[in-house]
Structure formats: C-alpha cells, structure tokens
Regions:
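Conserved phosphate-binding/catalytic region of the ribokinase-like
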Residues: 2-7, 154-155, 210-301
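Active-site beta-loop-alpha junctions enriched in small/polar residues
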Residues: 110, 138, 168-172, 199, ...
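Anion (oxyanion) recognition and catalysis
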Residues: 47, 73, 154-158, 188, ...
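Short beta-strand scaffold segments in enzyme catalytic cores
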Residues: 44, 92-96, 233-236
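Conserved phosphate/ATP/ADP-binding segment of small-molecule kinases
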Residues: 159, 173-244
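Glycine-rich phosphate/adenosyl-contacting loop at the front of the ribokinase-like
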Residues: 1-78, 117
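Short beta-strand/loop segments at the ligand-binding rim of alpha/beta enzyme cores
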Residues: 162-167
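Conserved N-terminal subdomain of the carbohydrate kinase-like
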Residues: 52-135
C-alpha cells in the first residue's frame, strides 16, 4: 500500500464518560469526568503505541468539547478533523460500574453534537490519506451522522484504505432493537476488519456461538473477524480458519471501560506495521496481533 499521512483515522462519537465512584460521606454518588467515545479511544490507544492517528468527529463548543480536544492534543492525535459546534451540546454518558467491572450506561444525547456532523464538514485531507479508516455503529443512530458515515466509508474505501468496523451496541441510543440490527448490519459489506463482542454476535449475525458468527461475517466478505470475550480473550478468524487466544490476567479487577477499545487500538497498530496486505496475513500472525491487543487491554482494567 502507498505511504499514507495517517496510519489510523477514526470517525464517530467523542463524548464525556461520567463514571461512578464510591459515595461520599453523605452517601451521595460521585462521578468522575473521563474522555470517552469508542472511536476516539481507539485513536488514543494506537497513538500511545506509536501509530500516526487522527480523529474525525464533532463535539459541542462547550467546556466538555474543549476538554476533549485538549485531551486528544495532549495525546498527539491529529485533531484537525474535530469540530466544536456551538449549536449542540457534547454528548454525555453516565456509566455505573459494578464490583465485577461490568457497566450500565445512560446517555444525554438528544441530540448530541456527534450525531450532527455533515459530510461537508469532513476533513478530506485526512480522510483521503489514511491506511486504516475505523468507524463504530453509534454514528448510525441518527441523521445526518448516518449519511456522513457512509459517505466517509465509501470515500476511504475508494481511496484504498482498510475499513475497520466495531458495531458497538448501546440499546438506549436506538429506537428499538430491530432498527439497531438493520443499521448495524448495513456497514458489514464495506468492512475489511470487524470487531464484535461475544454479547453482540447474535444481534449482528443471528448466531450466538462466536465461531459460527465469525465464519458468517467472513462469508459476507469480511477478511478478518475478531470476537472479544472479556476475560477469556478473543477469537480471530480469517481465510485460514479461526483460533481462540486467551487473555491476560488484569492487574486488578476494576473498571473495564475502554478495555475493548485499547485491545483494538493495539490490534490495528500491529496491522499497520505488518508490512503485508491484509489478505496475505496468516492466522498465526493474526493470533500474535490478538495476543498483543489482549496485553494492551489488560493494562487498562
């Protein structure tokens, strides 16, 4: 592949995660403000490993949007494609973290700035010169972001980028499950690489078993499929078949928020520097990349 200005460009939601903490002495629940949004997290994770990354998206021109931009700039992620819009608020997510590390979400996004990005607002200098273009599914919940997502994916693919897709399901952001299923599946024909969790396999493919789901996606034209399985690691599938790759023990059981994004940032980083076309990568090489991603994720828990 010809040299590109960016190794990985991500597009989609950037938001604030207000993550639950221990109650104060009066019993009031406290929340910590953290930068969030799966695509933005992936860009940061890959940049920390040394990849050249950029983010395309929109936040509000408010205290939260300014904070998010400063975080990406501090992490040395290219922010020329991050717009701050005074007409819309930055999306907020309230995250309840259980003792097990599992999470429940509530969103303030009616509408959020991230759902109001127009295709005319995309930074084409970045979009047209990236090796990997990564998107999620939360930009498909509302217009105009949905049309902008398809425009960006089609343009990047035409320009030779590898399309990476993470259908990240958040039930409360969709009108109903059937709508989510239709929209989330609509990007699969464009994807070269797909990451899903074992909780999303049935929704996205109709198959609950990770092996069957991965095989189905590969038959739909996806070259590489990764299914994350929490503490049990991940399952990787390509033309050579599939293999389960065990995870690493976390330093301690805690907040799992962002672990999957860190895994994917690590995996895409290895894809970037493989020195091979995606179709030429062996199952053994991909297994090594998954192991690397698992190690990165374990450091985030």
């Amino acid at each position: 592949m010809e040299d590109k200005k960016c190794d990985i460009t991500t597009f989609g939601e950037i938001l604030i995660d207000f993550t639950s903490q221990k109650p104060n002495e009066d019993g009031q629940m406290l929340y910590a403000r953290n930068p969030g949004g799966a695509p933005a997290n992936v860009a940061v994770a890959a940049r920390r490993l040394g990849a050249r990354t950029a983010f395309l998206g929109k936040a509000g021109k408010d205290m939260h949007g300014e904070f998010l931009r400063s975080v990406l700039e501090k992490e040395q992620v290219d922010t020329r494609g991050l717009l701050l819009d005074e007409k819309f608020f930055t999306t907020l997510a309230f995250v309840e973290v259980q003792e097990s590390g599992e999470r429940t979400f509530s969103f303030a996004r009616k509408p959020g700035a991230d759902t109001n990005i127009q295709k005319e607002e995309l930074n084409l200098d970045i979009l047209d010169h990236t090796m990997i273009f990564h998107v999620g599914s939360l930009s498909l919940t509302d217009q105009p972001a949905r049309d902008t997502t398809f425009y960006a994916v089609e343009r990047a693919k035409k320009n030779g980028s590898i399309i990476s897709y993470d259908p990240n399901y958040r039930a409360s952001l969709w009108r109903d499950e059937e709508t989510a299923k239709i929209q989330m599946r609509s990007l699969i024909p464009y994807a070269d690489i797909v990451k899903i969790s074992d909780e999303e396999t049935e929704l996205l493919t109709g198959y609950k078993q990770v092996e069957e789901a991965a095989k189905f996606l590969h038959q739909q034209g996806v070259a590489v499929v990764a299914v994350t399985m929490g503490e049990h690691g991940a399952y990787i599938y390509n033309k050579d078949g599939g293999v389960k790759v065990p995870g690493f023990a976390a330093r301690q059981i805690g907040d799992t928020n962002g672990a999957g994004d860190s895994f994917w940032g690590g995996f895409l980083y290895r894809i970037c520097y493989a020195g091979k076309q995606l179709k030429d990568l062996t199952k053994e090489e991909l297994e090594e990349y998954v192991r690397f991603g698992n190690a990165v994720a374990s450091l985030c828990v």
